[in-house]
Amino acid sequence: MNSNFCRALVDRGPPGGMQLGVVAPAGQTPLAATEPLSNVPFLLYPGHSEPPYYDAYTGVFPYVPFPGAFGVYDYPFEPAFIQKRNERERQRVKCVNEGYARLRGHLPGALTEKRLSKVETLRAAIRYIKYLQELLSATPDGAPPPATSPPPAHTGHSNVPQPSSLVAESSGSPFSSSPFLESEEPSL
């Protein structure tokens, strides 16, 4: 193919139709299209652009509705779809966060004082559930909890005994002694 020629794309429709073309370099004449392009679908969705951009191309695209550039995301119905999708995602994230907040509210009091990550919250909840299961399995039905267990403490939504290891110590982090915050090694 010769690099010195330039093709012109012309839609040979009615005078009110759209013309698209490439400007030929000075001193060269553009080659006419061998067949009309009226059967080729060409959709234009105007977007936003700077005035210098579309002023430079007003002669090339005389029937294109400028101002505007051609953008991929400028379809007429896409913004509503994106807004609905984003709203659904916001609602989902809000619901998940509320679930974690409720779960934190059911953990013993010492754990609710610190803002826990989602992973820390789940790990602490797992350990607390295991602790409660061990407590229930060690206690016969109808018998009071053993004397070594601390009295029930108010922890938000539940009135479950708080393990003594959750009480804050004066040295170090108040949560360093909590068995519910220790890292859990995955068992294979």
Swiss-Prot record:
| Pfam families on file | HLH
Q: Where is the stretch described as Basic motif?
A: 80-93
A single GO BP term for this record reads: amelogenesis
Cite the Gene3D superfamilies for this sequence.
Helix-loop-helix DNA-binding domain
The knockout outcome noted for this protein's gene is:
Knockout mice are fertile, but have enamel hypoplasia and small teeth. Abnormal ectopic expression of CDH1/E-cadherin in inner enamel epithelium (IEE) cells, but not in cells of the stratum intermedium (SI) at postnatal day 1 (P1). Inhibits the growth of clipped incisors. Significantly reduces mRNA levels of SOX21, AMBN, ENAM, and AMELX in molars at P1. Develops fewer, smaller, incisors at 3 months of age in a transcription factor SP6/Epfn knockout background.
**Start and end residues of each stretch annotated as Helix-loop-helix motif:** 94-132
For this record, the Gene Ontology CC terms, alphabetical, are: chromatin; RNA polymerase II transcription regulator complex
Q: Which GO terms describe its molecular function?
A: DNA-binding transcription activator activity, RNA polymerase II-specific; DNA-binding transcription factor binding; DNA-binding transcription repressor activity, RNA polymerase II-specific; protein dimerization activity; RNA polymerase II cis-regulatory region sequence-specific DNA binding
The annotated region (Disordered) lies at 139-188
Which CDD domains did the record assign? Answer: bHLH_TS_ASCL5 (cd19747)
Segments of skewed composition (Pro residues): 142-153
Q: Where is the composition biased (Low complexity)?
A: 169-181
Q: Which UniProt keywords apply?
A: DNA-binding, Nucleus, Transcription, Transcription regulation
Compositional bias, Polar residues, is annotated for 158-168
Q: SMART domains, alphabetically?
A: HLH
List the SUPFAM superfamilies hit by this protein, alphabetically.
HLH, helix-loop-helix DNA-binding domain
Tell me the InterPro entries matching this sequence.
bHLH_dom, E-box_TF_Regulators, HLH_DNA-bd_sf
Where can this protein be found? Nucleus
- Describe, as the record does, how this protein assembles with itself and its partners: Interacts with transcription factor TCF3/E12.
- What does the UniProt record say this protein does? Transcription factor. Probably binds E-box motifs 5'-CANNTG-3' in complex with transcription factor TCF3/E12. Negatively modulates transcription of target genes such as CDH1/E-cadherin, perhaps by recruiting the PRC2 repressive complex to regulatory elements. Regulates ameloblast development and tooth germ growth, perhaps acting by positively modulating migration of inner enamel epithelium (IEE) cells. Plays a role in enamel formation.
By what name is this protein known? Achaete-scute homolog 5
Q: Which organism is it from?
A: Mus musculus
Name of the encoding gene: Ascl5
